[in-house]
Amino acid sequence: AARTWDQLSVDGDTSTNDTVFVLASGAAGAAPVKARSREARELGLAIEAVARELARQQAADGEGASTLVTCQVSGARDDADARAVARAVISSSLVKAAVHGRDPNWGRIAGAAGNARLADAAVLEAAGLASDEATSRGGTAAIVDPDKLRIAIAGHLVYSGGIGGPVEFDRTAARSAMDAPELLIRLDLGLGEGTGEAFGCDLTEEYVVENSEYTT
C-alpha cells in the first residue's frame, strides 16, 4: 500500500472508511505460500501490480476528473523522499487546476515539490509529536535543490536547474500533449537513487459542483 494506495490522492482528504483488505478464503485448495519464498515474492509483486492499477483507476474516477495524472520522481535521496515529493505534486490544488487548464506551469510543480516535507511535518505535529521530533524525521528538511531539479510535462522538458532553470520549449505542443485522458509529470531531483510515483487527477468545475450540491 505504501507504493500504491498511499500514493493516491483525488483532493487530499481521507474518508473515515478508507480501508484495504486482502483476503484468502482457502477455497481454491492451493498450498499455503511460505514466507520469504519465491512464491511469496511473486505473490507480493502480483498484489502490488493489481493495487497500482486499482489506485490509478480510482484516481481517474475521481469526482469530476477529466485527466488521470501520474507523477514519477527519480533522483531523490531515498524512496520515501521520492514518494513524498510525488504525492505533494499530485495533491497540489494549483497543479491540479493547471492540468485542467492545459497549462504547462513548471513553477507550480516546483513549488509543490519543495513543500513536500513541510506538509509531512504538519501531520506529525498534529499527531502530537514535538516539532524537533518532526524535524528529526525529515519533516521540514529541504529535499529539493532547484539547481539540480529537472521537470518534464507530457514529455516536454520545461525546467532544468543544471542549465539555469526554465528552458525554452514549444508551449503550444506541450499544451496539446496535455490535452489527453492521461498526463505524466516527471521530476528528477538529482540527489540520489530514490524513486517513487503518485496518482491523482485534475481539479474541475464538476468537482466543485458535485461536492457542493449534496450533504452526508
Cite the ranges covered by each PLM segment.
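A structural signal for small-residue-enriched, beta-sheet-centric alpha/beta enzyme cores
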Residues: 1-216
